[in-house]
């Protein structure tokens, strides 16, 4: 791979942030369109989404309890699958009044989360034959030049790749417009691993109850590569239009 030919470097969640910006109006209508007292106006929300996208491009650190909760759960599952102790989070057992182990407590970023042990074991069993946190990358040709797409796949199994999600509320097709089921299968395909199936394995976490769901997608190169290319090229248009706001030189393959 000749890195000097690469014009841009994009990670999958950057494409998601760009999609959220493009769909600002639809997202606003979904959550606050019928609210008598919305937390912000539609124009204010679009400005907020724009800034979120710029921050994502620039890799500005952000604080999110929901993101930390997902990271902690992912790490617990990874450690169970790999039969190892975590170097990222502090984990301890949660017991009931009889001393029975009923959960796992994780401390991450000075936040404490508890997960039912039954849930942790169920999810880890599902991934017992998968490779956790597999780095992938591949070049995507575009009208602007070559773009390096890269990222970490949560779990790679022989016939399917997986992205583990945690959410407080799930609805069918929630991740249909996300980029992972295009970017990661594309990277594997370009590296000679033809793994067509992709799953979003979703854990809906309530205060007392939990539920698991699966969204499955099939990567079809003839259909999906043009979709991915258009998405990436539209993002490049945006980045070049606002280049003066971009401080992350890695985006332009300058470091």
Residues covered by each model-derived region:
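Metal-dependent nuclease catalytic cores that hydrolyze phosphodiester bonds in DNA/RNA
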Residues: 1-152
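Mg2+/Mn2+-dependent nuclease catalytic core
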Residues: 137-241
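Generic alpha-helical secondary structure signal
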Residues: 12, 25, 32-35, 97, ...
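A sequence-level detector of short, solvent-exposed, charge-rich linear segments
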Residues: 86-96, 180, 247, 251-254
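Non-catalytic C-terminal interaction segments of nucleic acid-processing enzymes
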Residues: 233-255
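Secondary-structure transition/capping residues
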Residues: 84-88, 195, 209, 246
């Amino acid at each position: 791979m000749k890195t000097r030919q690469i014009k841009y470097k994009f990670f999958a969640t950057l494409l998601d942030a760009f999609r959220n910006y493009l769909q600002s109006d639809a997202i606003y209508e979904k959550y606050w369109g019928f609210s008598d007292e919305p937390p912000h106006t539609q124009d204010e929300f679009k400005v907020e989404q724009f800034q979120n996208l710029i921050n994502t491009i620039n890799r500005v650190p952000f604080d999110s309890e929901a993101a930390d909760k997902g990271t902690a759960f992912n790490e617990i599952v990874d450690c169970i699958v790999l039969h190892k102790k975590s170097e990222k989070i502090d984990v301890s057992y949660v017991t009931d009044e009889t001393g029975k182990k009923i959960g796992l407590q994780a401390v991450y970023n000075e936040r404490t989360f508890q997960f039912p042990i039954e849930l942790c074991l169920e999810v880890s069993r599902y991934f017992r034959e998968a490779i956790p946190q597999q780095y992938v990358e591949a070049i995507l040709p575009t009208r602007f030049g070559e773009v390096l797409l890269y990222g970490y796949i949560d779990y790679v199994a022989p016939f399917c790749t997986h992205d583990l999600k945690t959410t407080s509320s799930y609805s069918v097709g929630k991740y249909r417009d996300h980029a992972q089921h295009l970017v990661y299968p594309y990277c594997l395909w370009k590296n000679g691993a033809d793994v067509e199936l992709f799953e979003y394995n979703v854990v809906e976490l309530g205060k007392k109850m939990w539920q698991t769901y699966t969204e499955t997608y099939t990567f079809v190169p003839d259909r999906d590569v043009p979709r991915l290319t258009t998405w990436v090229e539209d993002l490049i248009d945006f980045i070049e239009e606002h280049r003066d706001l971009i401080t992350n030189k890695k985006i332009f393959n300058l470091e």
